């Protein structure tokens, strides 16, 4: 039996390549300790790059000041939609996803200490305006060590 394949079938098999954004990432965890990742997919407007990356790199610096965080940012470089960026926050288990309300305020406070009192609100607004209206979403990724290569530090 011969069946035609639609564009959806081709799209499902599409390979997308990403480059690690070292200056927008911070991770002081031992490689392999984090098994759960909250991954945010962002679609950055063509002219939104400067505001997007300013906020992401500053968040990484604030995360470093707070410590005990795993934050990785990957920018789409080939094969996917223009402006596709992944932002991942790692934790040992699902409790790390639940305590986001404890961790994020600490990052916000460190951001303000580093860059000025109104910096977080202003930069976050510019960041939000740098994103396409549609296509942003989040996922939970689970790392299975028994099915994976040995862990290594990314940066």
Residue ranges and their predicted role:
Residues 20-22, 47, 92:
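Solvent-exposed coil/turn segments that connect beta secondary-structure elements
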Residues 9-27:
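Short, structured interface segments
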Residues 17-21, 60-88, 98, 117-125:
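Short, glycine- and small/hydrophobic-rich beta-strand elements in well-ordered beta-sheets
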Residues 4, 32, 36-43, 75-108, ...:
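Short, well-ordered beta-strand segments in beta-rich or mixed alpha/beta enzyme
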Residues 86-87, 95-96, 101-155:
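A cross-kingdom marker for long, charged
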Residues 1-11:
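Single conserved hydrophobic/aromatic residue that forms the stacking wall/gate
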Residues 44-53:
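Short, surface-exposed ligand-recognition loops at beta-strand->loop->(often short) alpha-helix junctions
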């Amino acid at each position: 039996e011969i069946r035609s394949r639609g564009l959806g079938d081709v799209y499902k098999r599409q390979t997308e390549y990403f480059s690690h954004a070292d200056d927008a990432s911070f991770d002081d965890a031992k490689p392999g300790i984090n098994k759960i990742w909250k991954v945010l997919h962002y679609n950055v407007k063509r002219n939104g790059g400067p505001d997007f990356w300013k906020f992401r790199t500053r968040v990484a610096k604030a995360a470093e000041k707070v410590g005990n965080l795993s934050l990785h940012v990957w920018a789409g470089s080939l094969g996917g939609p223009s402006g596709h960026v992944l932002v991942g926050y790692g934790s040992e288990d699902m409790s790390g996803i639940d305590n986001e309300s404890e961790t994020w305020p600490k990052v916000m406070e460190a951001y303000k200490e580093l860059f000025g009192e109104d910096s977080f609100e202003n930069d976050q607004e510019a960041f939000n305006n740098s994103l396409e209206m549609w296509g942003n979403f989040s996922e939970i990724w689970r790392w299975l060590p028994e099915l994976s290569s040995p862990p290594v530090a990314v940066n």
